[in-house]
Amino acid sequence: MEILVYIIIGIAIFILSLLVGINIGNRRMISTLATKKEELEVEIKNKQKEIEKMLKNAEEEAKALKQKELLEAKEEIHRLRQEFDSEAKQQREELKANEERLIRKEESLAKKEENLEKLKEKLEVQHENVLKLEKELETKLNEIAKMTEEEARQVVINEARDKYEREIAQKFKEIKDHYEEESKKYARWVITTAIQRYASDVTNEITTSTVALPTDDMKGRIIGREGRNIRTFEKLTGTDLIIDDTPEIVVISSFNPLRREIAKRTLEMLVADGRIHPARIEELYEKSKNEIQEYIKEVGKEAVMRVGIKQPHLEIIKLLGRLKFRTSYGQDVLEHSIEVAQFAGMMASELGLNVELAKRAALLHDLGKAVDHEVEGSHAIVGGQIAKRYGEKLEVVNAIQYHHNEVDPMTPEAVLVAASDALSASRPGARKETLENYIRRIEQLEEIAKSFRYVDKAYAIQAGRELRIIVQPDKVEDEIAEKLAHDISVQIEEKVQYPGVIKVTVIREKRSISYAS
């Protein structure tokens, strides 16, 4: 641009010089030219300023264009860098994934190699066991070759028993545990509900009764001349009359509660009457017998009313009343029967069974005990026969006869009666037994346990309500111990008579002892 300006200025000066040379003589023209020159110089200066301004604007535009292109170039570089970083990151991730995949494959191969090594060791052990078993079989075959047929048969039986005993015991335990858990939950709820809703007095066996006397002089009159009164009294009543130094008291002793009650009533009437001689004793004895028969009938009716069942035959009511004067392990049999009926009724109601049938069979379940000293047979069978004779339904008869497992049950109510009987008998304090029976039962329990194979020791504890059995730990495994406990409990049920429930516990203990010196 500067060159262009200089060219223009040069041309202008040339023209002016030409004009000056032509019109040298013409001052006016010179003056005009001078003026034109000045104007031209001013115009040149203005043009120069415009040119400078245009150059400046051009420079600014070029600078702006340069900055724009530079910014676009930077943005393009930034974009390319981002694309490069993204591709690099993706490649790094792919490399990392491939690396992890290779590591996993290496680990998998290492694990497979380890498993193969273990399998190899296991196969080697099995191979050794097979070789050992082959040697044992060879030895056994040599032994069997020398045996008789019976001896070989016994060996095979023993091997089969040892081989499958554990498997059978395990299966038995699984089934037993499953059904026990389910049944115990519901049975526990039903029995607990029945016990909570019923409570009765604890009874004890009493073999004596006392009669109060107005004065000690009455003792001599009771004895009579040469003891004839006391002999007559004891002969008629079948009791023993104990007269000692205890003031104003006479004791009547007998194991038969009915005889003892008749004797007590007879003696009380004799003392109240004051006339004591053999004829009067016989008269009042007969009167007491008649009164006690009426009392027995009333007691039977009251029992039926307490239980809340339909009236049975009159003879059955009388037999129920007689149970008032019978005891079993010290427990009043009539009160026990009422208690069993209440338990059976409540549990039948909870289970949705026939409440009337359960109560009726439960109340009559010990009916045979009223006549078991007169009729041969177990009281359960005899009781069922009596109930059948006096018109009771077959279901009631079956429940009576089943309650000691002497026949098969026909109805769920029969099983319920047996359970209620056991529940009443096992209630704490409900029953007691003589020392002789107790010792015999303890010995019998321990003998049954010791009769089983691999039993080392057996102890009956908690008054015979628990049997603890110590077995040989190297011969009996846990599963077999479970089956052993079951088998012993079955033997006890079959061979031992006992009130309540006996818990059988098998203990398998192995101790390893070492000494450091």
From Swiss-Prot:
SUPFAM superfamilies, per database record: Eukaryotic type KH-domain (KH-domain type I) (SSF54791), HD-domain/PDEase-like (SSF109604)
UniProt topology in membrane: Single-pass membrane protein
Domain KH as annotated: residue spans: 207-267
InterPro entries: HD/PDEase_dom, HD_domain, HDIG_dom, KH_dom, KH_dom_type_1, KH_dom_type_1_sf, Ribonuclease_Y, RNase_Y_N
A Gene Ontology cellular-component term: plasma membrane
SMART domains: HDc, KH
GO molecular function: RNA binding; RNA endonuclease activity
Residue spans crossing the bilayer: 2-22
Entry keywords, A to Z: Cell membrane, Endonuclease, Hydrolase, Membrane, Nuclease, RNA-binding, Transmembrane, Transmembrane helix
Residue ranges annotated for the HD domain, each copy included: 333-426
Record EC number: 3.1.-.-
Biological process terms in GO annotation: mRNA catabolic process
Subcellular location per the Swiss-Prot or TrEMBL entry: Cell membrane
Top EC class, one word: hydrolase
Family per record: Belongs to the RNase Y family.
Job description of the protein: Endoribonuclease that initiates mRNA decay.
UniProt-recorded name of the protein: Ribonuclease Y
Organism annotation: Petrotoga mobilis (strain DSM 10674 / SJ95)
